[in-house]
Amino acid sequence: MQSLRQNNLSAQIFHEVRPFFREGPRKLGSFENKLSLVHGKNYLQNHLVVYKYSMEIFPKIVVVAGPTASGKSDLALRLAQEFDGELICSDSMQVYRQMDIGTAKPTPDVQKIVPHHQLDLIDPDESYSAGKYARDASSIIEKVAARKRLPILVGGTGLYYRALMYGISKIPSIPEKHRKKVTGWHSEHGTNYCWKELQKLDPEGAVRLHPNDTARILRSLEVVLSTGTTLAEFQHDKPFAEAKYSFHAVALEWERDVLYERINQRTHIMLESGWITEVEKLLTRYSPELKPLQAIGYREVIQHLQNKLEWGAMVEEIQKRTRQYAKRQMTWFRKENNIGWHKPDDIDEILDKIKVYLEK
């Protein structure tokens, strides 16, 4: 099995060598005599050997990205069956045990069809970061490739995708004075006040967050107050200018109205499949204030169980928040220029392009 150290080395080689393939022809054309041209040719050939070595060590990956309810899981399953692959899930909610229906986690029967990784890693009262995901997923990619199978990354958590492919900048530790300041704001004035303060300091960040998303609002305030830099700027900063892996990324592009209707229908299906019972069981063990239980859908179901939301209002709120989330996902992934967007019925085209990519 190829070691992680080798993979890290090949990533470094890959990033060092790629510029030579961009600049090589121009530089060769600038040589003034034959001897210089020979030296230049040898120089480029040597780097080509190193580049080839790095790519042999570093496995190819297929990525299935895009917004919620767009059919990522079904497409990824089809690709895994077609290309002898294993699925590496990239969803920040599917890492939680006991949270299955509301996270649209693949069912046990589906998981038996092809191997799935990065599911059911922690309990709802535990934490899991994008950095930890990147390390764990890298290790799994290495093992899947060693089995001569295709690693297929599937999910809609853009930060996980970016952390794995490009790395993420480490956010400096938050000084206690800033943490106390933000906590004091929240204790004295509440979440809505903090959200309005975030609108002043980080307008773009505030727009992306629900006004009741206490944990993320406070975190965003801590970061911008202590560093002068928004949380999004840290998340979008790429330590690696080029991706750490060779990958081919696809996403399914639906008409917005159609996608929104899929979201609405899926909400009903989840509720009919026992989502209420799932949440009731969670509440026997965990506080409703836990971050995962404040996620889209779970919070609304809890409010319904607490008689704070009638059934119809609960359904509408889940649908609305999910549509808003899908819109944010679309915005995120649209900024990733290396994702190929396809119509839902273009499956044959997707398969053909992946075949070409894998045969290179």
Language-model regions, residue ranges each:
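Residues in and immediately flanking transmembrane alpha helices
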Residues: 12-15, 20, 36, 85, ...
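Phosphate/pyrophosphate-binding catalytic cores of soluble transferases and nucleic-acid-acting enzymes
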Residues: 43-360
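Short hydrophobic targeting helices and cationic amphipathic motifs
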Residues: 4, 9, 15, 21, ...
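Polybasic, low-complexity intrinsically disordered segments
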Residues: 21-43
